A protein has these predicted regions:
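RNA-interacting cores
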Residues: 1-225
Length: 225
């Protein structure tokens, strides 16, 4: 896997988007907490809606323990290393940082938002998305074809793609059907574009956000051949 390691030469430096990572202090949350978390964040910083590329990631603990995949209904413990990560237009970063020190209530737990750090995107060949909004009735092939058509608008041509696990997410009083997705063998320009734009809807609720495919939790999300 190639990976840009020299930040001075990274094409991500020229991007108008970046990651804003906040430390958090929270004991635990349910796996399915995207709607509640994002709703609280949007109440604090409604201006995050001003750029449709902006996104809010869900918080994640370990996806498996001793080889056993935890059920989606189980609460996840959050360590001191847990981060609240957003992808933000660089022009908005100072405004979004205003949530430092704020405290919100989620599922009876207190979540305190700490200091933030700004990071450029990590440019890698393979990207992974935990939750892509999908129609439950369509096949995996039709789903991938739909994704391919959307990404062509951003000059991203899919060479290799793999659907992973499907799951539903609670969204207010409704449920949303999602699939996980890995896209491989991207060019540097395509990798950056995918991380800037995402795919599909509800990016402010943890969906459609592409992450570097480098961690064990990403591997655990995919079905064996």
């Amino acid at each position: 896997m190639w990976q840009e390691t020299d930040q001075k030469k990274s094409i991500a430096d020229d991007s108008d988007m970046a990651e804003l990572s906040f430390s958090v202090n929270c004991r635990e949350l349910p796996y399915d907490h995207a709607y509640e978390l994002s709703s609280e964040i949007l109440n604090l910083i409604p201006q995050i809606k001003n750029d449709k590329r902006n996104s809010i990631q869900t918080l994640h603990g370990p996806m498996s323990g001793n080889g056993w995949v935890r059920p989606d209904s189980e609460n996840i413990p959050l360590s001191k290393r847990a981060k609240l990560i957003m992808r933000i237009n660089k022009n908005q970063i100072d405004d979004i940082k205003d949530i430092e020190g704020k405290e919100i209530k989620l599922f009876g737990n207190s979540l305190k938002i700490g200091v933030s750090k700004v990071k450029n995107f990590l440019i890698v060949k393979d990207l992974f998305c935990r939750f892509v909004i999908s129609d439950k009735k369509i096949s995996e092939d039709d789903f991938l074809e739909k994704i391919q058509m959307e990404l062509r608008n951003f000059n991203v041509n899919i060479k290799k793609a793999l659907c992973g696990r499907s799951m539903t997410i609670n969204f207010d009083k409704n449920t949303v059907y999602t699939r996980s997705l890995m896209i491989a063998d991207l060019s540097k320009e395509e990798s950056l574009k995918l991380q800037e734009e995402g795919v599909g809807g509800k990016k402010l609720y943890g969906c459609g956000i592409f992450l570097p495919h480098k961690s064990i939790d990403a591997v655990n999300n995919f079905k064996e051949d």
